[in-house]
Amino acid sequence: MKKVGFDNDKYLKLQSEHIRERIAKFGGKLYLEFGGKLFDDYHASRVLPGFKPDSKLQMLLQLKDDAEVVIAINSGDIEKNKIRGDLGITYDTDVLRLIAAFRGVGLYVGSVVLTQYAGQQTADHFAKRLEGIGIKVYKHHHVEGYPSNLQQILSEEGFGRNDYIETTRKLVIVTAPGPGSGKMATCLSQLYKDHQRGDVAGYAKFETFPIWNIPLKHPVNIAYEAATADLNDVNMIDPFHLDAYGVKAVNYNRDVEIFPVLNAMFERIFGESPYKSPTDMGVNMAGNCIVDDAVVCDASNQEIIRRYYQALCNDRQGRESKEEIYKLELLMNKVEITTADRKVVAAALSKADATGEPAAAIEFPDGEIITGKTSELLGASSAMLINALKKLAGIPDEALLISPEVIEPIQKLKTEHLGNRNPRLHTDEVLIALSICAVTNPTVQKAMNELHNLSGCEVHSSVILSHIDENVFKKLGINLTCEPKYQENKFYQN
């Protein structure tokens, strides 16, 4: 039974209601800067067990009749083919993906705004492509002195040069394929233009983390710092909120640093600022929906350890700086955890020591741990996967789900025809073999029926795994960590 620490239904209700209240506060028009992942927020679902990866999307669907989406993309990012690291696609391709995804669930995409536009040919080509599929395109220019030179920004030579984005709904969700796309500047430009036109509108910011109304050193907030260790974001007590209300609220350094500028900008536009602190600008209600703090703390601690192992492996592969590792070690010290608090680590390493070969271990939600060892036929991860499925299905450990007669021809194909040096079956190959065997073997089918129960389980490998195995675990929803070393000093896995 998976432990739940977050009430997702309560969140959907509270969050949508709170956004409606903010729309009403500003007379019926709100530009909502939407940070983080709108689709597939797996970080939130890991640290807040019970939070669904698509919760934010489901929440917005409750507002869809009043909402429209504006997607911002930096023209410079189009020019240099900037890649979204988690998906491996360019930012402009991701804009098309987002449009299709939003439309697919019934959200209205009003337009795309090309920010930092300076006549880039690639941006012009992209604009034509968007217009060809019926999407309105607007252009916002670089503003000299942004964000500190208010006189320049709030003038016809600043925001005045930007296109006014025509919107028709009460809630305008401004999102982007990644950071640095100009979401905030887009919102502020619209506020300036609306004010010039005599229209009333407001601004708010949606960020799930850090959670403002739980302690600064709460593991959920520390896990956010761990997730953004490469950005050097630091959680802090919002000094403006403390000064205005005498209440401690958590925010992060960039929002606190920019607030005096935003505040002055709001005063210039509205006559007085509607907000007394950066926390006031937010609409996040996630902290009100934590129902079991112990479960959430444990899940967040595990996330911090996972981030640490990921950084160690990235460093081993030459993709990480030592500073990020040091920061993660400091964060672990803050919440008083070590790698020993991840139980599967000791189990995997113990099995590896006993066999002298790579090993892997998986922990089920009830705390039970199953291991897998390397054999002539299977890699450790594949063996562990089979053992885990057998355990979940109540199949005796000695039962063979895939006979050697099935595995050996696959190995022959791999080594003699496909050029692989490693004959052992990867996890994807094992799953395909199991699927074929399940057609004629009800016992194997029984094991395959348990695949969905692997989601949320914890796995540790005594060596760095191949990208193939990593991707299989990711698709199964398994939380993987690896020791930062290769099998027998093999720097490339195939």
Question: What are the functions of these language-model segments?
Answer:
Residues 1-173, 190-351, 357, 364-366, ...:
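Flexible phosphate-sensing "switch/lid" loops adjacent to ATP/NTP-binding sites
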Residues 175-177:
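Residues at the beta-strand->loop junction immediately N-terminal to the Walker
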Residues 179-181:
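Walker A (P-loop) phosphate-binding loop of P-loop NTPases
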Residues 186:
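Hydrophobic positions on the alpha1 helix immediately C-terminal to the Walker A/P-loop
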Residues 202, 374-376:
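Residue-level structural signal for beta-strand termini and adjacent loop
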Residues 369-370:
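Hydrophobic "anchor" residues
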Residues 377-393:
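A short, polar/charged loop-to-alpha-helix boundary motif
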Residues 391-423:
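Short HxH-centered metal-ligating active-site micro-motif
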